[in-house]
Amino acid sequence: MSSLTNNTFMEEEPRGVTVIATKVAENSKNPRRYSLVHQASCETQHHKGIRRQNTIQHRKQLTDQMRCQKILQQLNDEGIEVIFTANDVTPIEFSIILTSTDPTLSNFVSDILQNMSSAKVQICHVETRGNEASHDVLLACKATKNQLIHSAELLTQNHVALTKFSIFAKKLSDEKNQSQIWFPRHISELDQCSKCITKYEPTTDPRHPGHGDVAYIARRKFLNDQALEFKFGDEIGYVDYTEEEHATWKAVYEKLGDLHLSHTCAVYRQNLKILQEEKVLTADRIPQIRDVNKFLQKKTGFELRPCSGLLSARDFLASLAFRVFQTTTYLRHHKSPHHSPEPDLIHELLGHVPMFSDPLLAQMSQDIGLMSLGASDEHIEKLSTVYWFIVEFGLCKEDGKLKAIGAGLLSAYGELMHACSDAPEHKDFDPAVTAVQKYEDDDYQPLYFVADSIHDALAKLRKYASSMDRPFSVVYDPFTKSIEAIESSADLEKAFSRLSNDLSAITHAADRMKISITM
């Protein structure tokens, strides 16, 4: 489970979680687990709230600039923003929808053209639609701020039957909007994506298992402070875990052991066995992150990066694009080893690491990360939901039985048994459907998505990616650990050049194999 998803891993009974530190969380219903889905939804609503507050303020400011107050009463919120952000020098392109109860459409159109012309607004396109009660006219226009305001004032004053005046910014497939959304282009820029924005702390919530434990709180703060200091290029420090922490790790490790044999997918079992054989994961001692990274780098190129808690959904997903997983370093409280109200190191190591050792699951996680770069808030929320339901709580079919592939299940004894039972509903994994699935969290989840295999899930995810409306594509360069945005033919040529070199080597190897076979 990522430090981003701040999940409550339930082993016995449901427990509430109060999330502190952000106004969004304070105003939200306290969830049983503070999930990636919940976080992304909160961020979307938070941004919408900010935009709404700005619009209200801008509407007040425009009151002093516009003589006819009737316009402001009729004008939509987007229209307010179009006018507010325009200037008197550079013309902008926009659309207007006008509605009139004038029984004669020709009179309405005539008034529009006359008043727009008087205000020197350039009309590029006109469409009309009418019925018995009213007429609608859509116009594509070009004008400066003063010209736009003047045309609105004239039309409102001269056409008394006008009932609707809506302005919309020109949409260029959201290209300009999305191109302005910052995202990291090099792995070093993940330093800007590692700020913890929400914390579920034992210092603030009495329902946290560690609440009131001064030693645990101090230990947790020490580990979080270390994580905050980590920067790209730093060697991940050695953590001297206490005997109490090792005992907590062992208790969870051994309790999940038998269940892992019967309830988890073959990929997980195979990689867990290798991790155990190579002594990366053992029951007695908590592994060091840097040792785990050496293993992952050889297997799939993934690596763990220390962070202090909950990141934004956008930042967490962006990290996956570089095959970086932001991980907490603290452990759950020793008095509640089989229940964690948030992601902790035990979840990261027992849930995610064996799955990140699989090339297909690693690729699927990176694909979700790449899809998130430059995406809108709405798409971030959808991608977070897909990630949650497949990478964290996904199931697959093996030999006619349900097996866990999601890290949230693989590290949670109680929910793992529940998910694979007949109690919840199970649906075939379809990213388009999963992306809009409402997340329920009053108790164990009532619904889980099931993939035929990890390969099947990856194929469906890539098909879903092709349907996303984004004005550019991105390619990850593993040599420089950087992201290339493909926006022009020149960018495409560069990407093809690298692909051509790889294909040449593969073709050469294939030719040699043919020669060997014929001999």
Curated annotation (Swiss-Prot):
InterPro entries: ArAA_hydroxylase (IPR001273), ArAA_hydroxylase_Fe/CU_BS (IPR018301), ArAA_hydroxylase_sf (IPR036951), Aro-AA_hydroxylase_C_sf (IPR036329), Aromatic-AA_hydroxylase_C (IPR019774), Eu_TyrOH_cat (IPR041903), Tyrosine_3-monooxygenase-like (IPR019773). Disruption phenotype: Reduced (30-40% of wild type) level of dopamine thought to be due to defects in dopamine synthesis. Defects in serotonin signaling. Affects mechanosensory behavior including foraging and exploration activity. Hypersensitivity to odorants. Blocks the enhanced slowing response phenotype caused by bilobalide, a neuroprotective plant chemical. No significant effect on lifespan. Shows rapid reduction in reversal rate during tap habituation that is rescued by exogenous dopamine. The keyword rRNA-binding does not apply. Its main location: cytoplasm. This is Tyrosine 3-monooxygenase. It comes from the Eukaryota. Involved in the synthesis of catecholamines, such as dopamine. Has a role in serotonin signaling. Required for normal explorative and foraging behavior. In response to food, involved in promoting the dopamine-mediated suppression of crh-1/CREB1 transcription factor activation in cholinergic SIA neurons. Modulates male mating behavior by controlling the protrusion of copulatory spicules from the tail of males during hermaphrodite vulval location. Plays a role in modulating tap habituation in animals. The gene is cat-2. The modification Phosphoserine is found at S35. Belongs to the biopterin-dependent aromatic amino acid hydroxylase family. It catalyses: (6R)-L-erythro-5,6,7,8-tetrahydrobiopterin + L-tyrosine + O2 = (4aS,6R)-4a-hydroxy-L-erythro-5,6,7,8-tetrahydrobiopterin + L-dopa. Pathway: Catecholamine biosynthesis; dopamine biosynthesis; dopamine from L-tyrosine: step 1/2. It is found in: Cytoplasm, Perinuclear region; Cell projection, Axon. Fe cation binds at H347, H352, E392. It is an enzyme of class 1 (oxidoreductase). It holds the Pfam family Biopterin_H. It comes from Caenorhabditis elegans. Keywords: Behavior, Catecholamine biosynthesis, Cell projection, Cytoplasm, Iron, Metal-binding, Monooxygenase, Neurotransmitter biosynthesis, Oxidoreductase, Phosphoprotein. Gene3D superfamilies: Aromatic amino acid hydroxylase (1.10.800.10). One of its GO terms (molecular function) is iron ion binding. Plays a role in promoting amphetamine-induced loss of motility in water, termed swimming-induced paralysis. Its cofactor is Fe(2+). GO terms for cellular component: axon; cytoplasm; perikaryon; perinuclear region of cytoplasm.
